[in-house]
């Protein structure tokens, strides 16, 4: 009879252990799901002087960006278009698709993110597959004369 009681107590103990372990595994899975959810942020930057404006707003999710970019430079045509690309560390590399003088164009743009600024990169370009792209991204010069400052999105 005492052996039977030990048997029941052991069985109940094993059931409790199994139930506790199952609950722990479920908690771990939920934590992983919450941590692996894609994080999305929207950022806005602008450079404004008396006669010039450069502005962008984009959403960053899992290293990919989508948004808009606008150039309104004195005595030049206004360009407004879409931006799609990726963040590589502190560097944003994207295609800027825009309309200028009634012509749809696509060109590569590269911005360096430094503190709360986006600084545009400039360098030699060439046409590839109907798009203007940089010949050598490693040779780009980043012009800090027109830094876009981070601002609150409207």
Please provide the spans of the model-predicted regions.
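Bacterial N-terminal signal peptides that target proteins for export
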Residues: 1-9
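Tryptophan-anchored aromatic micro-motifs
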Residues: 36-52
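Short, surface-exposed coil-to-beta transition loops
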Residues: 51-55, 77-82, 103-108
